[in-house]
Amino acid sequence: SIPCAESCVWIPCTVTALLGCSCSDKVCYN
């Protein structure tokens, strides 16, 4: 999986979620 430039510690993945990224271990991964 490729780490996206967004974290999801306090809020879920937002912008990167539109690119197919999902939360994993506090970081958004594609």
Swiss-Prot record:
Detected in stems (at protein level). The keyword Transferase does not apply. There is a cross-link at residues 1-30 (Cyclopeptide (Ser-Asn)). It comes from the Eukaryota. Keywords: Disulfide bond, Knottin, Plant defense. One of its GO terms (biological process) is cytolysis in another organism. The keyword Iron-sulfur does not apply. Disulfide bonds join 4-21, 8-23, 13-28. This is a cyclic peptide. SUPFAM superfamilies: Cyclotides (SSF57038). InterPro entries: Cyclotide, Cyclotide_bracelet_CS, Cyclotide_sf. The presence of a 'disulfide through disulfide knot' structurally defines this protein as a knottin. Probably participates in a plant defense mechanism. Has cytotoxic activity against HUVEC cells (LC(50)= 1.83 uM) and various cancer cells including HeLa (LC(50)= 1.81 uM), MCF-7 and K562. Displays very weak hemolytic activity. Belongs to the cyclotide family. Bracelet subfamily. This is Cyclotide hyen-M. It comes from Pigea enneasperma (Spade flower).
